[in-house]
Amino acid sequence: MKKRTKKKLRALLGLLLVPVVLTGCRIRTTPVGVFAQIMEYAGQNNSQASSSHGHGTYHTESQPSSTPMPQMDYDSLDTIGEVQTIMVYLVGSDLESDYGNASLDLDEMEAAGVDTAHNNILVYAGGASEWQDRGLSGDECTVLLLTDTGFVPVDTYPAENMGDPLTLSSFLNYGFDFFPADSYSLILWDHGGGPVLGYGVDENFRDLLTLDELSEALGDSVGAHMTKLEWIGFDACLMSSLEVVSVLAPYANYMIASQETEPGWGWNYDFLSELSDEVIPGDVMGEYIVDSYMDYGEYVFDYYPNLYSDLTLSCIDLNAYAEAEEALNDYFAELDTSLDVQNYPRLVRNRARVRDFGTYSSDMDYGMVDVLHLLELVGNDSEAAQAAAEAVENCIVYSGTNMDNAGGISICYPYQTDADYRDACIEMLYYLGFAPNYTRFLEDFYAIENGDTLLADREISNAETSVTTQNDGAYDESDITL
C-alpha cells in the first residue's frame, strides 16, 4: 500500500466520522455533530508524525491538556480500600449534557452498596459541556471517590482534554500512586465507535481517543508501573473487537465490552455489590457485569417494549489473544492465496450474510462483523478456519446476547462502506500490526471489487458486483454478477 500523507489521513478520518445518529434509546455511538466538530478541529491542528512502518498515522492530534494531575492530599479521607481499585474514566459528552446518563450511572454506583472499606471506586468526571446533577461543572474535571455515604469530590481541576492520552494516563497513575490495592481495573465510559473510530468524545475539546492513543495512555501508566490491570471494561458501543483486544492485551487480563451498540442507560452498576474483602478475578467479575447488563435490559424491555434493542456483552480473556491472532493470520493467508475473480462471488455472498453490528440503530455501516460467524460462512470447512474458530472461542470467557450469531467478539471487515472508511480501516490495521495476512486479504478483496491489480500482481478485469436478496433472505451465486 502506498505511503499516505498526513493531510490524506486527516481527510479520511474527517469523512468517515460523520454519519452517525442517535436513536430514541440515546445509544452510545458518537453523534454526527460532535464527530464533525472533532474532525474539523483535527484537520486544523493535526501535526502527528508518521508511524514507523511508513503507512502514516490514523489518529487525531489531541489538543494539549492543561497539566498532568498534581499530587493530592487525602489525609482527610477516613479509609482507603486495599483490595481492589476500580478507576472509572467518565467522559460525560452529550450523554450527560443532553440526557444526564453519567449522573444516573453515578447514582447506580452509590446505590449498589459497595464495600468501600476494602475497595476504591475512583471516578474522573469531565468531558461534558454541562452536568445535569451533582453540582459538577463543564469547566472542570473532578475526581470522585465512593464512600459509605456516597461520592465525595477529592480533587478538582480546570477542564482537561479527555481525548488526550496524557489525561487518561495521568488519571491511571493517580490511581496507582494514591489508591494502592491488590488489584486494579478500569472502566471507560462514553460513546464508542469501534476500532476505526475509537472511544470517547470530549465535548469541550472536540476530541476522542483512537486505538493508538489508547495504547499510548496505557503504556505510559499501566506499562510504566509494570502492573497489569485485572480487567478493562468499555461501557460504550461496538468495542468488543479483536483489534481493540490487540491494544489491551499487554496491559490487562480481561476485557468486558459490547459487539453491538449499547442503549443510553449502558451498564447496570449493581454488579459493584459483589465487591468484598477478597479480590474478585476478572473472569468472575466479567460474568457479574454481563449478567447484570442483560438482566436489566430484559427488565426494561418487559416494561417498555418500544425501547427494545439488540444487546451484547462479553468477557474476553486477553491472555488467549496471541494464539487467536496467529490462527487467524494463518487462515487468512490461506484464503488470500485462493482469492481470485472466480471465487470472489462466493466471498461476497457470504460476507453479505455475516452478522454485523451497529447498523440496527444508526445510518452508518461500521463494517463490524462477528468473527465466529464469518469463519463459519467463509471457512468452507477449512482446517485452518476451524483452528482459527477454536482459538477465538478460547478467548471468549462469557457472553450474553439477545441476537442470533453474535458469538462475543468482532472484527472490522468493511463491505458496503465507502472507500474512505475502508482506507481508514486498512490504515488502522497497519498501524496496529494486526494479523498482516488479514490486512492483505482485505486489500486484495477490495482490489477485485475495484478492478485493480492484486497485491500478488494478479491481473483481473474491471468488476462490478451486484447482490440481490431472494424473498426468503437467502443469497445464491446466481444473484451475484461480475
Enumerate the predicted regions with their spans.
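Bacterial N-terminal signal peptides that target proteins for export
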Residues: K2-L13
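Terminal, contiguous helix-loop blocks that mediate binding/assembly
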Residues: E40-T79, G194-P195, Y199-L482
